[in-house]
From Swiss-Prot:
EC class: hydrolase
Species: Escherichia phage lambda (Bacteriophage lambda)
Organism classification: Viruses, Duplodnaviria, Heunggongvirae, Uroviricota, Caudoviricetes
Domain of life: Viruses
Entry EC number(s): 3.4.21.-
Region (Disordered): 303-327
Protein name in the entry: Capsid assembly protease C
Family listed: Belongs to the peptidase S49 family.
Subunit annotation: Capsid assembly protease interacts with capsid scaffolding protein Nu3. Capsid scaffolding protein Nu3 multimerizes and interacts with major capsid protein gpE.
Pfam families: Peptidase_S49 (PF01343)
Gene Ontology annotations of biological process type: proteolysis; viral procapsid maturation
Amino acid sequence: MTAELRNLPHIASMAFNEPLMLEPAYARVFFCALAGQLGISSLTDAVSGDSLTAQEALATLALSGDDDGPRQARSYQVMNGIAVLPVSGTLVSRTRALQPYSGMTGYNGIIARLQQAASDPMVDGILLDMDTPGGMVAGAFDCADIIARVRDIKPVWALANDMNCSAGQLLASAASRRLVTQTARTGSIGVMMAHSNYGAALEKQGVEITLIYSGSHKVDGNPYSHLPDDVRETLQSRMDATRQMFAQKVSAYTGLSVQVVLDTEAAVYSGQEAIDAGLADELVNSTDAITVMRDALDARKSRLSGGRMTKETQSTTVSATASQADVTDVVPATEGENASAAQPDVNAQITAAVAAENSRIMGILNCEEAHGREEQARVLAETPGMTVKTARRILAAAPQSAQARSDTALDRLMQGAPAPLAAGNPASDAVNDLLNTPV
């Protein structure tokens, strides 16, 4: 492990005196492992009062197994149109890797992968493949809000495979749907904090630490002295407020009441218990999760397509009926009653709709008002839902073309002009008279 990853002071600054959302069993393993690295002589549970010596801490760690080996982390994959985002190990605010790395996953990496998947046209849905005991509070609520935002763009499902506790439960709660395996552990909706006191150990080593500060609360919770009661009460208030915020978020995401969430008292649930508690929706085998989600997305798509087709059919039928009424202007009441009582087949409805549409178009193009306004009449006829009556009113108010106006004026002039002189041969009497005229 690199020196940067073994920066123990930095790790201690994030692990102590900061609220953590960790599953209890993992928290014991975590602090036992950290105790050996930081020289902590004992661990004390503030609630139960139980203490572990350094030797007992190491024994507890040994029973839990060695976690220094390589962790299998899956890369970002798109499987059957579903983006699979692994979320494993301890959740931390930031890492340099988008993927789970060295036993931890960064909230920043989860957000970045979510945003990429949401904008990927090849992705129909997103599956968070979760195996995490939780982690830092810092960044957790923002990450959960991003999940809730993305689920409005594309379905985001969470799979507890085989754990999403504490901060992991917060993220899973923000998903559209939550799947659990039969042995998955979920829940632990609570907050914890650890305080370390090196004062006695430093005193034995002859080391004296002097803190020089300004501001009465500047060194609250420092690791070189006993935790005063008033400081502990302040930290406890922070824990209670954070837990309340945690419960409110889970309530907003899942629909459970805040009190129901608080009543879990940070309990951990397994498999079906999580469904009974309202923290999960479906029990699945982890290998079937992709298929289950794909089938659900396909069924949803079919329902949406069917709904659109039904609406379009209804709209066409209503439009055709209205158009036919406009053309004929008279619809006997008995005919409407019979139509309501009868259930015509689809072909009859289509035939009636086509006939009504043809009548509507021809009624607009051939009406008296369309003369001299042919282009406008064509546009009106192409307008969906435009009735003959409305089109005639619009055309009547519109000016005619210049050619139509000239033709109309000439017609009026010809109607008012005197009758033309008739051409023909003169009568025979007139001819005779002309011939008899003396010269």
